Design a protein with these regions (language model features):
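An amphipathic alpha-helix adjacent to DNA-recognition modules
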Residues: 3-6, 10-14, 18, 23-27, ...
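The alpha-helix within a helix-turn-helix
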Residues: 31
């Protein structure tokens, strides 16, 4: 798995977060938008909240 894929997940998540609330974003939407498999998402993150934690920690 590449850093590019992980960054694509983060970028897609941030784009979605700008348009709707966190509780309305699903893993399925993220992977469909990225064009990746759900297993790829779960390789990097346990769930949406794990992704959010990664985004917040890298922003600081």
């Amino acid at each position: 798995m590449s850093k590019f894929t992980q960054q694509a997940i983060i970028d897609t998540f941030l784009k979605m977060l700008a348009c709707k609330s966190l509780d309305k974003i699903t893993v399925k939407e993220i992977v469909n938008e990225c064009g990746i498999n759900r297993n790829t998402f779960y390789y990097y993150y346990k769930d949406i909240y794990d992704l959010l934690e990664d985004v917040v920690s890298t922003e600081n």
